[in-house]
């Protein structure tokens, strides 16, 4: 059966349980393995704005949200620069034509950000779009609205200096949403007076109803209360867990009940009150990798036990060239750590933290997008829209460069699905494929 036929069959089976993602899909922010990697092969080795371009679809505005891909559909969150409205888009993966477009509320501006930053998620039948306004929409693949929720109305305002940016997680039949936010709702002039607590929430993806809500308590005070990281699953310690990172702690929660099983808080011993967290955890080799704020060290953890864990759970640390915003990549048994401001990539042995190699990627802009691992390569993109392709493995090598945009603030991570690359710039979504030919 063709990929298109498989997708149509999934739609026809709308009353059944969710279908499993194949290696050719990219269903949520960090991909099918939740670590930025995919088993995709046959991707184009060289490309540009005119070379190996299958299609290039203009977008109504910028966003840090990563496109998600299932079969012949691409789902994209955006903002319309002309109307300042938030949008949910469905694009045909074969042609680049817009299948449907839905308005999803009013945008709010935040410093260097907008409310379309969280990435959508899909299971092949439903696409869930979440926004920094805390509005969540579930659409079927035809674009019909199944349900919507206003989490600010139900669970309080998300007060973060740069606007809420955490992406939802679909895992084992639940949709997880995390709000690691400042307790003072009106701190940045965007919310009502009063205080509200951070939380981890599980909802029924079919109905949108809350299954449980777990308070995410912390003694952090100041901007350090805020985190832009996303929840990540972890199969460790004898069961399925959801990892939540920010507000001075990494916590592991029972995926079924939300109960906090353990927490570790060793990355901010001086209690610096502006150390907000942006990168999400990465899991690999039975370890959890977390990246401290503002280029402070990263840590590899073995979180065994319960309650408050001490630093005996730290397997190793690395602090020379580490990110502030981008999330690291676990790919083919290696850990790739971007220093997003210095534009340096380091390849580490994930078991020991020993550097295998390090390479300067160059370019004139910082990197905020997280790297992709696919087809034996590492794909990075800086804020100016320049893509840098590195060889994965034992030797550092830059394989290709491509200027894909003329505008700054390109922050969406590159994804691979169905033998193609999807690159979102400030103004366009590119679909790149081998032998697609030149584009005028």
What are these regions (language model features)?
Residues 1-4:
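N-terminal secretory signal peptides that target proteins for export/translocation
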Residues 6-7, 210:
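Short amphipathic alpha-helical "recognition" segments used for binding
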Residues 8-18:
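Bacterial N-terminal signal peptides
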Residues 21-440:
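Noncatalytic, solvent-exposed loop/strand surfaces
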């Amino acid at each position: 059966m063709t990929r298109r036929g498989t997708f149509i069959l999934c739609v026809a089976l709308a009353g059944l349980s969710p279908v499993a993602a194949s290696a050719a899909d990219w269903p949520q922010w960090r991909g099918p393995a939740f670590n930025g990697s995919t088993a995709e092969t046959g991707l184009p080795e060289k490309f540009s704005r005119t070379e190996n371009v299958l299609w290039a679809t203009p977008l109504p505005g910028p966003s840090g949200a990563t496109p998600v891909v299932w079969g012949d559909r691409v789902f994209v969150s955006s903002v319309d620069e002309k109307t300042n409205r938030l949008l949910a888009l469905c694009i045909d993966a074969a042609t680049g034509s817009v299948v449907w477009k839905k308005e999803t509320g009013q945008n709010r501006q935040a410093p260097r950000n907008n409310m379309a930053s969280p990435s959508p998620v899909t299971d092949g039948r439903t696409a869930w779009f979440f926004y920094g306004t805390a509005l969540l929409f579930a659409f079927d693949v035809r674009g019909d609205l199944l349900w919507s929720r206003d989490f600010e109305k139900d669970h309080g305002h998300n007060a973060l200096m740069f606007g809420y940016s955490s992406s939802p997680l679909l895992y084992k039949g639940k949709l997880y949403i995390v709000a690691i936010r400042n307790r003072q709702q009106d701190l940045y002039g965007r919310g009502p007076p009063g205080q509200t607590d951070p939380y981890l929430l599980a909802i029924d993806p079919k109905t949108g109803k809350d299954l449980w809500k777990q308070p995410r308590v912390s003694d952090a005070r100041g901007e350090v209360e805020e985190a832009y990281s996303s929840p990540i699953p972890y199969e460790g310690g004898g069961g399925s867990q959801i990892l939540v990172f920010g507000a001075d702690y990494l916590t592991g929660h029972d995926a079924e009940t939300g109960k906090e099983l353990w927490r570790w808080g060793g990355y901010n011993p001086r209690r610096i009150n502006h150390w907000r967290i942006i990168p999400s955890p990465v899991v690999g080799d039975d370890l959890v990798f977390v990246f401290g704020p503002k280029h402070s060290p990263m840590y590899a953890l073995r979180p065994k036990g319960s309650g408050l864990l001490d630093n005996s759970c730290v397997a190793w640390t690395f602090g020379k060239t580490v990110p502030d915003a981008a999330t690291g990549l676990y790919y083919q048994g290696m850990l790739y750590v971007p220093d997003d401001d210095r534009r340096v990539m380091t390849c580490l042995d994930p078991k020991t933290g020993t550097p295998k190699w390090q390479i300067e990627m160059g370019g004139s802009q910082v990197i905020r997008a997280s790297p992709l691992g696919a087809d034996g390569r590492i794909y990075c993109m800086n804020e100016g829209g320049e893509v840098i392709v590195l060889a994965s493995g034992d030797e550092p090598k830059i394989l290709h460069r491509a200027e894909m945009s003329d505008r700054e603030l390109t922050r969406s991570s590159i994804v691979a699905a169905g033998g193609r690359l999807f690159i979102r710039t400030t103004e366009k979504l590119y679909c790149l494929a081998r032998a697609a030919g030149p584009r005028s």
